[in-house]
Amino acid sequence: DKAIEIAETLAKIKNQAMHEIVAHYYCEISHFYLDNKDYERSLLFLKRAIAQDKQCVRAELALANLYSAQGSYKLAIKSLKKVYAKNPEFLYEILTTLSFCYEQSGDEKGLAEFVESCLVDNPQTSLYLFLYDYMQKTGANKISKQRLHEHVLKYPSIVGLNTFVKLVEKEGAWPGDDATTILSSLEKIISSLPRYKCNECGLAGKMLYWQCPRCKSWGETKPVYALNERG
């Protein structure tokens, strides 16, 4: 109750930076209710968070996860697409849940079409390979190997190359021992790379913190997949 009172007081301050902080407070309150299985109040405070900050990725992600857990897959897909629209850097954060929701909705082609549209502005190799692998599994319109090779050469990266070698090995087109050695080396390099970085103070690591533990800023920690994609 005290947390809600503080958030409501701060919400009255007409300042965008403050509204962003209030949105995070509402997300914290929503998480508390979610832990106590009070889904109605959890949903209420997520909507309040978005009302405070329409660009709040955290609230939209939580909303998608809540919808998915309740079996409202189409609503979850809608929220996940909003995450990408608000901040394309979070694309890889939503792909697993998005795949699940599309599959549960019986719309396997829908995911392929969405990823294809994302590739226009984000031509990362690992995203392209995700699409290739997904199409192989689902039997959707498949990408030719020639087109795949051309993309890997055009957009070289450590992460993309690692995924590409895995696919080639799985298809039996590469001697096992050679592929294993290359994969082992690539994965050691990738494991040393940070997954997230605070834009405010530069703190980098493997965990996504909505409030940076070093500088205490809210919402400044972002995925660095794009950075790792540059090779």
Question: Which role fits each region the language model picked out?
Answer:
Residues 26, 33, 67, 101-102, ...:
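Residue at a conserved register position within TPR or TPR-like alpha-solenoid repeats
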Residues 2-10, 39-48, 73-84, 107-121, ...:
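Alpha-helical repeat scaffolds
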Residues 17-24, 41, 58, 92-93, ...:
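Start-of-helix register in tetratricopeptide repeats
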Residues 26-33, 45, 60-67, 79:
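TPR/Sel1-like alpha-solenoid repeat signature
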Residues 22, 28-29, 63, 97-98, ...:
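Structural register within alpha-helical repeat arrays
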Residues 15, 54, 88-89, 122-123, ...:
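Short coil turns that delineate tetratricopeptide repeat
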Residues 153-231:
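Cys/His-clustered metal-coordination modules, chiefly Zn-binding fingers
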